[in-house]
Amino acid sequence: MTIRSPEPEVKIVVEKDPVKTSFEKWAKPGHFSRTLAKGPSTTTWIWNLHADAHDFDSHTNDLEEISRKVFSAHFGQLAIIFIWLSGMYFHGARFSNYEAWLSDPTHIKPSAQVVWPIVGQEILNGDVGGGFQGIQITSGFFQLWRASGITSELQLYSTAIGGLVFAALMLFAGWFHYHKAAPKLAWFQDVESMLNHHLAGLLGLGSLSWAGHQVHVSLPINQLLDAGVDPKEIPLPHEFILNRDLLAELYPSFAKGLTPFFTLNWSEYSDFLTFRGGLNPVTGGLWLTDTAHHHLAIAVLFLVAGHMYRTNWGIGHSFKEILEAHKGPFTGEGHKGLYEILTTSWHAQLALNLAMLGSLTIIVAHHMYAMPPYPYLATDYGTQLSLFTHHMWIGGFLIVGAAAHAAIFMVRDYDPTTQYNNLLDRVLRHRDAIISHLNWVCIFLGFHSFGLYIHNDTMSALGRPQDMFSDTAIQLQPVFAQWIQNTHALAPNFTAPNALASTSLTWGGGDVIAVGSKVALLPIPLGTADFLVHHIHAFTIHVTVLILLKGVLFARSSRLIPDKANLGFRFPCDGPGRGGTCQVSAWDHVFLGLFWMYNSISVVIFHFSWKMQSDVWGTISEQGVVTHITGGNFAQSAITINGWLRDFLWAQASQVIQSYGSSLSAYGLLFLGAHFVWAFSLMFLFSGRGYWQELIESIVWAHNKLKVAPAIQPRALSITQGRAVGVAHYLLGGIATTWAFFLARIIAVG
């Protein structure tokens, strides 16, 4: 850290009125490209228009202009998010049974969508309890609203209006910061200021304001709700905020005001800032006093972090200095040159952010069931399954996106002349060793993980159960995972003496939390079946990484195509006369990576769904006997491929297949329709472009005969376009099929 004299002059970091506001461009599709602006001569035009409309790099080379467009587009994105969020709250206010659910969350199911009768589809309005007919929702909004302290549909309505106001504000900001006061490039590149503001402002003050809301509004309201007070009798949020005596009745330390804070007797506040661990036995969620404490602690951390970087005051860290000092004995120039990359290539910046956010999203998926954060979330099995599946899918897509933008960076923004012997250069120079080793790992994992299943299927088919890998024959116990579980389960008495319970009930310890005779959470046993499927996870993840990493490391050149960088991010083949060079572009690696990402996530969500139904979810009798939904069949059935097909896919598909004529029938139709969408994708993936061009020309001939030929000449999709349409339908069909299968099943039995 260095101290230097502050710079006296104030920098002007915006440009006034750079681009005049005009609707003329809206009337000219493709205005950003000379070729596209001419209008369509063939049907390829509409595909190119969609491919390039948001590729700001292709509109201009001016980094400042690109940065402004991205910045402005982000405000548009935020506006859409606020409108969507507002819609969710509006549905809660106008079409939901939220108030009824709030009064009896264990027997009434959440619903916020009522279908209008047009052709008989009002059959979808099932009886969710409390005299309400509607579609059961599994988004978790009701649980989130209760945790926030929302007690009436009027409050939801007000929040929905607030969301629209914010959306309008964002749309205005997007226009203002592009047309009226656009930031200069230097502003986008001022990383120290950006870090300070994002860390202290967004994360620090954001967490602090949420902690404040939790303490002053959520905690008292939830305390009263847990005690069984009628929501209509509970004081309104502003009464708690303005009247300290009301809060002091529930949390005595409030009567002392800020004195304990300034006299450093912070433990006085332990009545509302707790460190209990475990779950609230009334709601089956984390103690909200624990989460308030957590957000306050996070706020302090980020407020400190937001004061670490050197800006106008000449004190603090410089990011460039940190990176350039970061070198070890074996890493050459270390991180030298990365600062220049991250301040001039938004693709590089985005790739890192997507990789981290994707990983974080997957971590969130796992925490949502292991440490259910909201009241009555853990016993709403449909919502638990939906939240896990949703966050896993999102995480998978973000990680593939990280590889895509890393490859775009390599092709468009990487300058080999400025990167010498730093870590990026060194990784690129031994890429052959990396990829060949990774390939070996994939082969090893694939043969061994699959081989264990094949062995079990064979022994099972031959009637030799004693020779199978199972918990009752040849055991392959996940000893490392069990060791980690045990250390965490024992922590409260040993390594974490102040904690009253372990971080998650899933670690072990024998406690069962049941809410309304349903299991919220209990210790999750791991055995041979988990060991087998874990290695399938390892296999699919490593193959996904192999494909994506190969795409990035060979994006600029390879032995096959040394001048690949000149061909761009996506290209079908290396020109005529060079056979065997198709499907090698960085784009094609992203395309292939998406399929393996789909494989990976499918195995994970299947594992989760079956494991939870078999070993966690279920009912508990007054004698304390737990009856699981599928009766603990995971350990015995998930050790063969046949078991997965017969006892998971087929057995649990009965609800979606037999849903016709019931309120779940929409899932039956989706299941069928999504299979069709998936099958439709194969038509694009398995067929060549020439086949379609030939067919089109024959059809055009017939139109010419009848003098009804179109002015815009029809053309077959290019190879790349066909693959894009194919993978989109493959993923859409696959995801919607899984969605229908999961929800019909879990709503029927959960």
Swiss-Prot record:
Keywords assigned by UniProt, alphabetized: 4Fe-4S, Chlorophyll, Chloroplast, Chromophore, Electron transport, Iron, Iron-sulfur, Magnesium, Membrane, Metal-binding, Oxidoreductase, Photosynthesis, Photosystem I, Plastid, Thylakoid, Transmembrane, Transmembrane helix, Transport
Binding site for [4Fe-4S] cluster: C573, C582
Annotated GO MF terms: 4 iron, 4 sulfur cluster binding; chlorophyll binding; electron transfer activity; magnesium ion binding; oxidoreductase activity
Cofactor remark from the record: P700 is a chlorophyll a/chlorophyll a' dimer, A0 is one or more chlorophyll a, A1 is one or both phylloquinones and FX is a shared 4Fe-4S iron-sulfur center.
EC number: 1.97.1.12
InterPro entries (alphabetical): PSI_PsaA, PSI_PsaA/B, PSI_PsaA/B_CS, PSI_PsaA/B_sf
One of the GO biological process terms: photosynthesis
Binding site for phylloquinone: W692
A Gene Ontology cellular-component term: chloroplast thylakoid membrane
Entries under Pfam families matching the protein: PsaA_PsaB (PF00223)
Annotated chlorophyll a binding sites: M683, Y691
Enzyme class, UniProt record, top EC level: oxidoreductase
Binding positions for chlorophyll a' per the UniProt entry: H675
Catalytic activity line of the entry: reduced [plastocyanin] + hnu + oxidized [2Fe-2S]-[ferredoxin] = oxidized [plastocyanin] + reduced [2Fe-2S]-[ferredoxin]
TM ranges: 70-93, 156-179, 195-219, 291-309, 346-369, 385-411, 433-455, 531-549, 589-610, 664-686, 724-744
PANTHER family per the UniProt record, alphabetical: OUTER MEMBRANE PROTEIN, OMPA-RELATED, PHOTOSYSTEM I P700 CHLOROPHYLL A APOPROTEIN A1-RELATED
Alphabetical list of HAMAP family matching this protein: PSI_PsaA (MF_00458)
Its job: PsaA and PsaB bind P700, the primary electron donor of photosystem I (PSI), as well as the electron acceptors A0, A1 and FX. PSI is a plastocyanin-ferredoxin oxidoreductase, converting photonic excitation into a charge separation, which transfers an electron from the donor P700 chlorophyll pair to the spectroscopically characterized acceptors A0, A1, FX, FA and FB in turn. Oxidized P700 is reduced on the lumenal side of the thylakoid membrane by plastocyanin.
Similarity section: Belongs to the PsaA/PsaB family.
NCBIfam families: psaA
Protein name per Swiss-Prot or TrEMBL: Photosystem I P700 chlorophyll a apoprotein A1
Species annotation: Marchantia polymorpha (Common liverwort)
